[in-house]
């Protein structure tokens, strides 16, 4: 569903719980960004991005964590990127929302980790190899696959995080192609 529509988000959470039972795993992979300078952008972009990148995570966690606490187990994995740790040029409408998202996830991890809920933040430090990504930035259209994070590899890492033993839970996990400059 459109996670920026909070009423619809709540409705979908209730429907999933009613039809399938309480989820044990939540993957928050919603993202919206505008990449312009402060003066070229619009202040309302920050609010729109915040609603998708951060507020939707809060509503999902609020709807699903009570059942995880009751079951004494659960996994919440939030996907993000380097904007969560540093603002760069052309990200004043995006970076603050990703930083807030990471801090929210960290707060949830500290609150609910002792209750059996593993919360992790997966930072993908690369463009992801999708048709949308390749057409969004013209210089990426003809680039070799090796410069991109591959969706299957990201999914494999998410699965790995979700399967971690309680004695070795991670929170900040960074992944990137080997040629990514960092």
Stretches found by the model and what they are:
Residues 29-30, 76-83, 122-124:
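SDR active-site strand-loop-helix element
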Residues 22-23, 37, 68-81, 114-117:
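Active-site loop of short-chain dehydrogenase/reductase
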Residues 24, 32, 39-58, 77, ...:
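Catalytic Tyr-X3-Lys loop
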Residues 15-26, 34:
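A glycine-rich helix->loop->beta "capping" turn
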Residues 114-123, 141-182:
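C-terminal helical subdomain
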Residues 61-62, 106:
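A short, exposed helix-loop element centered on a Lys and neighboring polar residues
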Residues 1-11, 43:
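The beta1-alpha1 cofactor-binding region of Rossmann-like NAD(H)/NADP(H)-dependent oxidoreductases
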Residues 75-100, 106, 110-113:
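Catalytic loop of short-chain dehydrogenase/reductase
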């Amino acid at each position: 569903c459109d996670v920026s529509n909070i009423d619809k988000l709540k409705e979908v959470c209730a429907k999933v719980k009613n039809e399938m039972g309480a989820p044990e795993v939540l993957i928050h992979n919603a993202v919206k960004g505008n990449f312009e300078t402060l003066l070229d952008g619009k202040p309302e972009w920050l609010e729109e991005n915040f609603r998708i990148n951060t507020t939707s995570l809060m509503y999902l966690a609020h709807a699903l964590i009570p059942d995880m606490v009751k079951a004494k187990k659960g996994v919440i994995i939030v996907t993000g990127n380097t904007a969560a740790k540093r603002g760069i040029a052309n990200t004043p409408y995006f970076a603050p929302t990703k930083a807030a998202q990471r801090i929210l996830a960290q707060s949830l991890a500290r609150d609910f980790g002792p209750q059996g809920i593993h919360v992790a933040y997966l930072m993908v430090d690369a463009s992801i190899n999708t048709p949308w990504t390749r057409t969004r930035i013209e210089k990426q259209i003809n680039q070799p696959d090796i410069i991109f994070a591959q969706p299957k590899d990201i999914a494999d890492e998410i699965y790995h995080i979700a399967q971690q033993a309680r004695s070795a839970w991670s929170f900040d996990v960074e992944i990137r192609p080997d040629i990514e400059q960092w």
